[in-house]
C-alpha cells in the first residue's frame, strides 16, 4: 500500500489512560557497550540523526499501522518511526497475493505481531523485524536485500526468527530439550519475544485452521511456548496462550467452563465490588494512595485447579482475586496489615514473593482471607514496578526507557536496576555479564544466562532424539555420540536440510 494516500495519524491519538495519576520520573539510563548505532540499525537511507519526533510526526502511515504508531508514541515519543512505514511497504509488496487461512491478506499477520510487540514497549529494530519476520522465509525477498535496506541489526533479528521457524523437533524429543533448544537458538532475547508474539497472533486465529492441526499447534504451545513466556516473566502472553491452547485442545471443556464462569459473573462482581470498596475505604482513611483492581482466574487456570485438586467447578471458591498496587515495598507491607485488620487470613495461604521472588523474577505478596460473607478472597499486593514486571517480564525494560526519559508511563514509577537499564540499550550481548554487574540480580537472570551462555549445544537426530555435545563439535562428533559404528561408517552429513563437509562446526 502506498504511503501517498494514507491519512496522517495525530500525535496524541488513542492510548489507554492509567488507572491513577500520570507518573513521571527523571531516571538515568545506564549505557552499555556494543549497541549498534542508529545509522547502522536501519540503513543510511532510512534514518537521519535530525528531526526525531517532530520529523516523524508528519510522516503518513498506512491505516493498518495505526495501533503500532499509537503504542510507539505512547511509550517512546522521541522514536524515529519512519522506518516502520518503509518496512510495512516492503512486507506488503512481497506478501502481496498471499492469504491467511481466515481469508485476510497475509500482511495483517506481521502487522498484528508488530502491534503486540509495540504494546510491550518495543522500539524500532524489533518493530521493523516484526513487520519483516516472514519475508525472507515466505517470499523472494533475500537476507542480503533486507540487510542493505534496514541494516544488520534488523536482519539479525529476522534471521533468528526464521531459524526458529525452520526447527523440526521430532516426536521423541523431550519437552525440556526442545525448550532448551529454542532458548539456545535465541541468543538475543528479542528474537524469542518476536517468536512469542508470532505464536500469539497465530493462536488467536486457530479458529480458521483445521481442528486437528490447531490442536497439535496448541499442544506444542502449551508445552513449549507458554512455559517459555512464563520463564521470561511474560504472564500476560502466557495466560492468553494457555487459554487459546486450552480452547483448541479441549473445546467442549473450555466452553463449559466459560459458561459456568458466565453464570457466576453477577454474583462474583457483587462480591468483588464489596471487597474493593472496603479496601479502598480503609486505605483512603489512612491516606495511603493505591490502585485496587479485581481479576478473574483464567479459564485454563481454573481447569488445572479442578484437575489437580480433584474438585468440581462449584468447589473452586477463589475464582476472583483482588490486586492492590502501591508505590513502595514498605507500603506493600503496610497494606498487608490493613487487610489483616479487615478480614481473618486463611491459614497456610500467605506467600511473600517480595522477599523471596520466584525464579522468573515475579514479586508480590499473596494471601487468602475470609472476605465479605466469610467467602475466600485471594489478594495480591505489589508495587507498580512489580506489576509491570509481572505482566511484561524481560520486555518491561522497553517501558522503563520511557520512564527514564520522564515520559508518561502506565501504572508505575521506576528506579531501574543495573540489569534492566543495561537492557534498555538494545542487544543483550551477555546476560551473564549483566547479572554479574549487579550483586542483587535476580535468580531468573542468572538461570537464563546459564542457559544462553552454555558451552553445550543440543542436536536432534532425524528421529527427534536429542544429543548434547560440546560447543564446536562437528558432524563426526555427532555420529560417534550416537554410536561408534555410526561414526566409523559416516561419509557425509546433512545439517538443517543441507549437505555439509564433515569438518563443519555444528551451529
Protein language model regions, located:
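Active-site helical microenvironments for divalent-metal-assisted chemistry
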Residues: 2-377, 382-450, 459-465, 507
Amino acid at each position: 500500500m502506498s504511503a501517498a494516500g494514507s491519512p496522517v495519524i495525530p500525535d496524541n491519538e488513542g492510548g489507554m489512560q492509567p488507572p491513577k495519576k500520570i507518573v513521571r520520573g527523571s531516571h538515568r539510563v545506564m549505557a552499555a557497550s556494543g549497541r549498534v548505532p542508529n545509522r547502522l540499525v536501519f540503513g543510511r537511507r532510512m534514518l537521519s540523526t535530525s528531526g526525531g519526533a517532530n520529523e516523524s510526526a508528519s510522516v503518513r502511515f498506512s491505516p493498518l499501522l495505526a495501533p503500532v504508531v499509537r503504542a510507539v508514541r505512547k511509550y517512546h515519543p522521541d522514536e524515529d518511526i519512519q522506518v516502520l512505514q518503509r518496512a510495512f511497504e516492503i512486507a506488503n509488496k512481497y506478501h502481496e497475493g498471499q492469504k491467511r487461512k481466515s481469508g485476510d491478506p497475509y500482511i495483517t499477520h506481521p502487522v498484528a505481531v508488530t502491534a503486540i510487540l509495540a504494546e510491550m514497549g518495543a522500539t524500532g529494530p524489533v518493530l521493523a523485524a516484526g513487520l519483516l519476520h516472514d519475508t525472507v522465509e515466505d517470499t523472494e525477498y533475500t537476507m542480503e536485500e533486507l540487510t542493505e535496506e534496514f541494516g544488520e541489526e534488523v536482519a539479525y533479528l529476522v534471521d533468528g526468527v526464521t531459524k526458529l521457524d525452520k526447527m523440526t523437533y521430532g516426536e521423541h524429543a523431550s519437552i525440556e530439550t526442545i525448550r532448551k533448544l529454542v532458548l539456545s537458538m535465541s541468543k538475543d532475547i528479542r528474537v524469542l519475544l518476536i517468536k512469542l508474539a508470532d505464536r500469539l497472533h497465530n493462536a488467536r486465529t486457530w479458529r480458521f485452521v483445521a481442528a486437528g492441526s490447531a490442536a497439535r499447534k496448541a499442544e506444542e504451545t502449551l508445552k513449549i511456548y507458554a512455559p517459555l513466556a512464563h520463564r521470561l516473566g511474560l504472564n500476560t502472553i502466557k495466560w492468553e496462550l494457555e487459554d487459546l491452547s486450552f480452547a483448541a485442545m479441549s473445546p467442549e471443556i473450555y466452553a463449559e467452563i466459560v459458561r459456568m464462569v458466565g453464570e457466576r459473573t453477577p454474583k462474583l462482581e457483587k462480591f468483588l465490588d464489596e471487597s474493593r470498596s472496603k479496601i479502598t475505604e480503609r486505605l483512603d482513611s489512612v491516606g495511603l494512595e493505591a490502585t485496587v483492581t479485581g481479576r478473574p482466574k483464567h479459564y485454563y487456570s481454573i481447569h488445572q485447579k479442578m484437575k489437580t485438586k480433584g474438585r468440581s467447578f462449584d468447589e473452586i471458591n477463589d475464582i476472583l482475586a483482588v490486586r492492590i498496587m502501591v508505590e513502595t515495598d514498605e507500603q506493600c507491607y503496610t497494606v498487608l496489615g490493613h487487610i489483616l485488620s479487615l478480614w481473618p487470613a486463611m491459614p497456610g495461604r500467605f506467600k511473600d514473593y517480595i522477599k523471596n521472588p520466584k525464579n522468573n523474577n515475579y514479586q508480590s505478596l499473596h494471601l487468602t482471607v475470609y472476605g465479605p460473607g466469610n467467602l475466600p478472597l485471594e489478594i495480591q499486593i505489589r508495587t507498580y514496578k512489580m506489576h509491570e514486571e509481572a505482566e511484561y517480564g524481560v520486555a518491561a525494560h522497553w517501558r522503563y526507557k520511557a520512564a527514564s526519559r520522564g515520559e508518561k508511563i502506565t501504572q508505575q514509577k521506576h528506579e531501574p536496576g543495573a540489569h534492566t537499564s543495561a537492557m534498555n540499550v538494545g542487544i543483550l550481548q551477555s546476560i551473564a555479564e549483566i547479572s554479574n554487574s549487579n550483586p542483587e540480580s535476580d535468580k531468573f537472570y542468572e538461570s537464563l544466562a546459564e542457559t544462553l551462555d552454555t558451552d553445550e549445544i543440543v542436536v536432534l537426530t532425524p528421529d527427534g532424539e536429542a544429543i548434547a555435545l560440546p560447543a564446536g563439535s562437528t558432524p563426526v562428533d555427532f555420529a560417534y555420540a550416537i554410536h561408534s559404528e555410526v561414526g566409523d561408517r559416516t561419509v557425509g552429513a546433512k545439517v538443517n536440510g543441507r549437505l555439509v563437509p564433515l569438518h563443519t562446526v555444528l551451529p
